[in-house]
Regions:
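Bilobed periplasmic-binding protein-like "clamshell/Venus-flytrap" ligand-binding domains
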Residues: 14, 61-79, 120-124, 163-199
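Periplasmic-binding protein-like
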Residues: 1-35, 83, 178-187
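Structural transition elements
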Residues: 22-61, 77-80
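Short, solvent-exposed loop/beta-turn-alpha elements that line the ligand-binding surface or hinge
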Residues: 33-53, 111-117, 134-163, 191-220
Length: 220
C-alpha cells in the first residue's frame, strides 16, 4: 500500500516509452481497454496517488525500520529495468531502502518462485492473459507473488462459477476494489510496441498479441 501511494506513474511510463505518448497509456484497470466487456470505470481507486505523506505514514504503521527491500529486475528487457530504476528513486524518497537486484531473465524467473529470495520483481502481463478475469495471473494464488488473499480468491471462485455477464462484471468491479485495498501487485499502465510489416505480406493479423504466421503469405 505504501508503494502504491508513493509512486508518480506518469513520468515512469513516459520515460519507459521513450517520451512517446503513443507508446504508453495510463490505466488502473486489470483489463485493457481493448477488452471493453471487462474494462471497468471506478473513480477514486488508490492508483497514482503521488501521496508521499500517506506512503510514509503507511510505512510507519507497518513497523518498517529501513530493512533492505529486495527488488528484482533485469536488463534483458530494457523497459523493466527502466521501470525499476525510476520506481527505486521514488520509493527511496518516502523511506524505502531498496536493494535493487539486477539479474538475467532466466535467474529472475527461477528466483521469483521462491518467496525467500526477493520482496518484489518487475514483469508484464500480455493481453492473452486478460481475455477473462479468471485467467488473470495477478489475482492468482498460484503465480509468483502469490495473491492468496481470501477475499480476492473468493471473488475469483464466484467469477468462475457465474455465467450471467452482468453479474460477472459486477464481481469484477468488486475485485478491483479489493485488489486496490490489498495491493498485492502494483499496476502502472499499458505499454505498446511498434511493428512493421512489408506490403507484400498478406493475411497477417495485427490485432493479436504475439506473432502468428498461420494463413500468412507473400504476394509479390
Amino acid at each position: 500500500q505504501a508503494w502504491q501511494a508513493a509512486i508518480d506513474i506518469e513520468p515512469i511510463m513516459k520515460n519507459v516509452a521513450g517520451g512517446r505518448s503513443e507508446f504508453y497509456r495510463m490505466d488502473y484497470n486489470l483489463s485493457v481497454a481493448e477488452l471493453p466487456e471487462w474494462h471497468v470505470k471506478i473513480p477514486g481507486l488508490p492508483w497514482n496517488e503521488r501521496n508521499k505523506e500517506k506512503a510514509k505514514r503507511l510505512l510507519q504503521e507497518a513497523g518498517y525500520k529501513g530493512e533492505p527491500f529486495r527488488f528484482m529486475t533485469t536488463q534483458e528487457y530494457k523497459w523493466m529495468y527502466d521501470f525499476a530504476l525510476i520506481t527505486k528513486q521514488q520509493l527511496e524518497d518516502v523511506g524505502f531502502n531498496i536493494d535493487l537486484q539486477v539479474v538475467d531473465w532466466a535467474t529472475l524467473i527461477k528466483r521469483r518462485n521462491n518467496p525467500k529470495e526477493y520482496d518484489a520483481f518487475t514483469t508484464g502481463i500480455g493481453m492473452g492473459a486478460m481475455y477473462d478475469p479468471t485467467h488473470h495471473d495477478v489475482v492468482s494464488c498460484g503465480w509468483p507473488g502469490w495473491t492468496c488473499d481470501a477475499e480476492i480468491q473468493r471473488i475469483q471462485s464466484e467469477l468462475a462459477r457465474e455465467i450471467d455477464p452482468k453479474k460477472r462484471f459486477a464481481l469484477w468491479e468488486q475485485q478491483h476494489r479489493v485488489f486496490y485495498e490489498q495491493a498485492p501487485v502494483i499496476r502502472y499502465g499499458d505499454l505498446f510496441g511498434l511493428r512493421a510489416i512489408r506490403s507484400t505480406v498478406k493475411g497477417f493479423d495485427e490485432n493479436i498479441e504475439r506473432m502468428r504466421v498461420t494463413n500468412v503469405w507473400l504476394d509479390r
